[in-house]
């Protein structure tokens, strides 16, 4: 192959644009600290059910719980509007001709992949709007034969599997959380919302808004300009930011509403 291909710089390979495989195990530390802050804030006002502790890295459990009219409700917490809703590596199954989620084998990562599957992420990646009709990536074709990946393979895959953003409506996110009995979400700097349904009936007493943000699924490649190595990954991100909610459980006036309706 032409030597001019060696070391070709692609914008997808930027070291500042981190993908799933770049992320350290403590990437969510700021998010965990924020969850702990809200937990302590509510706990100080006796607004947390007895015995509950934050889930931390356990993606299968709610981030927090709060009391309303004597009943506990689950709460999802995001540090800010830039927080992702899940990331994963992507690989291709040569036998089934399907993309699938892949990554680390920690409990946190496995639960995250399961959540993304339930959200239909694998289906989105395999759709015609994504990479469903693009054929077999040479990266995985080579690996299935135990052959070395070449610069030419990289150029081929970078051309035939362009990075894409696929829009996902808010109902998909709401349905996913509702299936886990989570109907409320707090986003730092934006406020507190209900998703899909408002089982606590908080709209009767507060200015809480229905979450109206939309998501986008990013599918991408990333490699190095010094070697032909590269990989594929995906991330679920906020696309259209939600309208700011006047109800915010971190603010004193909203906390007063919770306290007044605690039991």
Each model region followed by its residue ranges:
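Terminal low-complexity, poorly structured segments
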Residues: 1, 14, 19, 60, ...
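A short, highly charged nucleic-acid-interacting micro-segment common to nuclease
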Residues: 3-37, 53-59
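Short, intrinsically disordered low-complexity segments
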Residues: 2, 8, 217-219, 230
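Extended hydrophobic/Leu-rich segments
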Residues: 1, 5, 18-21, 47-48, ...
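A short acidic/basic microdomain associated with nuclease active sites
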Residues: 39-70
């Amino acid at each position: 192959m032409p030597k001019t291909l060696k070391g070709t710089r692609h914008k997808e390979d930027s070291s500042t644009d981190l993908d799933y495989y770049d992320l350290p195990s403590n990437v969510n530390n700021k998010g965990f600290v924020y969850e702990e802050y809200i937990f302590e804030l509510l706990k100080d006002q006796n607004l947390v059910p007895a015995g509950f502790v934050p889930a931390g890295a356990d993606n299968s459990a709610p981030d927090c719980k709060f009391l309303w009219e004597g009943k506990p409700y689950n709460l999802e917490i995001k540090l800010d509007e830039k927080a992702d809703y899940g990331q994963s590596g992507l690989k291709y199954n040569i036998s089934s001709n399907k993309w699938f989620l892949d990554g680390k084998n920690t409990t946190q990562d496995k639960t995250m992949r399961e959540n993304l599957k339930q959200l239909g992420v694998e289906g989105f990646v395999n759709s015609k709007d994504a990479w469903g009709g693009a054929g077999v990536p040479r990266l995985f074709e080579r690996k299935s034969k135990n052959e070395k990946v070449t610069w030419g393979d990289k150029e081929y895959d970078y051309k035939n599997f362009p990075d894409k953003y696929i829009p996902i409506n808010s109902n998909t996110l709401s349905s996913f959380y509702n299936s886990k009995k989570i109907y409320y979400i707090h986003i730092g700097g934006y406020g507190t919302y209900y998703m899909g349904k408002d089982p606590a009936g908080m709209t009767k007493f507060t200015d809480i808004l229905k979450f109206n943000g939309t998501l986008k699924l990013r599918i991408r490649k990333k490699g190095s300009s010094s070697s032909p190595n590269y990989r594929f990954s995906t991330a679920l991100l906020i696309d259209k930011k939600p309208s700011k909610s006047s109800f915010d459980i971190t603010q004193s006036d909203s906390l007063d509403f919770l306290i007044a309706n605690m039991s």
